[in-house]
């Protein structure tokens, strides 16, 4: 089993920016990329992500969940052990979350060889608006960012989940990642990229957007009875049209463009902070 350092500090004040980390290679060439996802080691989106990554770097590492981990957000496993199974050269499945995958890859399985970039995806379905709070795809990228690795979450929108246009992400993904790397982004930021549900030739330009409200209207619980007479419950999202803010991610995606939104772990609401500051002491 490949092993490495057991500890790596979170990114903080004085850490190099993502652009500086990436540009350390002459000619902006990446040496190694770490891949993960939330749909699991056998997901078609992970195969697409591998296609994208192999056009960007010679050394690709895959550390992905053994089973589907959709909706686990930034969770990491603190109360049960993580099992690792080797599935090929630099390819591992673990009994954990996308966040666990990022930690296991960067801090252990890669043997101390830091990745130049972490890519998480390609998710089956868009990750937009407030649903990014639940997204394991975004959570995996956010964890990579907190470990000091430039990180991008990638998702492919669909109308019919059984007719996902994976070729769109596969065809356009390498160019999108190269364009973003050439620009660079902040040290405490990860990027959330969504591809529209269109053939590659019909897709618009890469567009910067803000995180909108999205389509999430609420949650619901669906209940049934199994063959043994025991009840079971499924938690599901309830979606529908909602008014979006200016420059929203969902409006840009529905217009047929590839959307990128920079996301941070700092969730402080500045407007509410200033309101509360009028009555409460500050640290």
Where are these regions (language model features)?
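Electrostatically charged, flexible surface regions
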Residues: 101, 166-283
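Glycine-rich phosphate/pyrophosphate-binding loops
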Residues: 145-168
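Glycine/threonine-rich flexible loop motifs
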Residues: 126-135
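N-terminal amphipathic/basic-hydrophobic helices that include classical n-h-c signal peptides
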Residues: 1-26
């Amino acid at each position: 089993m490949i092993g490495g350092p057991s500890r790596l500090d979170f990114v903080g004040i004085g850490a190099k920016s993502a652009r500086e980390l990436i540009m350390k290679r002459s000619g902006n060439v990446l040496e190694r990329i770490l891949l993960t996802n939330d749909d699991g080691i056998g997901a078609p989106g992970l195969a697409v992500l591998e296609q994208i990554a192999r056009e960007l770097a010679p050394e690709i590492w895959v550390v992905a969940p053994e089973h589907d981990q959709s909706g686990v957000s930034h969770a990491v496993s603190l109360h049960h052990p993580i099992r690792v199974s080797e599935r090929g050269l630099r390819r591992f499945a673990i009994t954990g979350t996308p966040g666990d995958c990022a930690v296991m890859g960067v801090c252990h399985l890669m043997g101390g060889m830091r990745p130049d970039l972490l890519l998480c995806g390609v998710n089956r379905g868009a990750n937009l608006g407030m649903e990014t709070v639940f997204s394991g795809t975004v959570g995996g990228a956010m964890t990579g960012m907190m470990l000091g690795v430039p990180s991008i979450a990638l998702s492919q929108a669909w109308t019919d989940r059984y007719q996902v246009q994976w070729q769109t992400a596969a065809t356009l993904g390498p160019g999108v990642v190269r364009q973003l790397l050439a620009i660079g982004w902040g040290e405490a930021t990860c990027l959330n990229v969504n591809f529209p549900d269109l053939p590659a030739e019909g897709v618009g330009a890469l567009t910067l957007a803000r995180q909108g409200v999205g389509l999430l209207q609420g949650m619901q619980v669906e209940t049934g009875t199994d063959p043994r007479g025991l009840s079971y419950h499924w938690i599901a999202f309830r979606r529908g049209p909602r008014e979006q803010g200016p420059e929203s991610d969902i409006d840009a995606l529905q217009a047929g463009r590839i959307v990128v939104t920079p996301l941070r772990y700092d969730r402080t609401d500045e407007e509410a902070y200033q309101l509360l500051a009028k009555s409460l002491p500050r640290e």
